[in-house]
């Protein structure tokens, strides 16, 4: 999808800017400035939605300046997060977003077990007979699930895991009425636009 106004008055641009991390220390980052068209506001944060061509949206939420990112995350839940996105306002937003990369690795066996996936991790109860059997008669079961995620955000778009998404170009000449610059810790997510499900979510507390 490409949305182009009758006159191009604002282009994406990149400039050096300060970013203040979770401890208040500052570093110089490459800040990407752009104009977006969906403004998010909830009790303790503001943010924006940046659309991508492939049916995904980049979502950013910036907690209030006097609120620690850890406190903000601790009070988040899926219901309020999705409600905030669903209630986005069609408002022009002047945004600033730093280039960043993040990579995490997490063991998921315990998480999946708590979610109810018990038998698969039990060497006696697991049933993977449709996949095959051990020649010595031992049962197949899952001993470890390792989840690795990687995201890179720059002026060319966002690359998450093995999938690359490209921003939708949105241009217009209406007066901007909101301003959201991600110059301190923030929460970000990539959302499947069709069903509203987050496919990637994280927090940038230091760059």
Model-derived segments and spans:
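Hydrophobic-core positions in well-structured secondary-structure elements of globular domains
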Residues: 6-7, 11-207
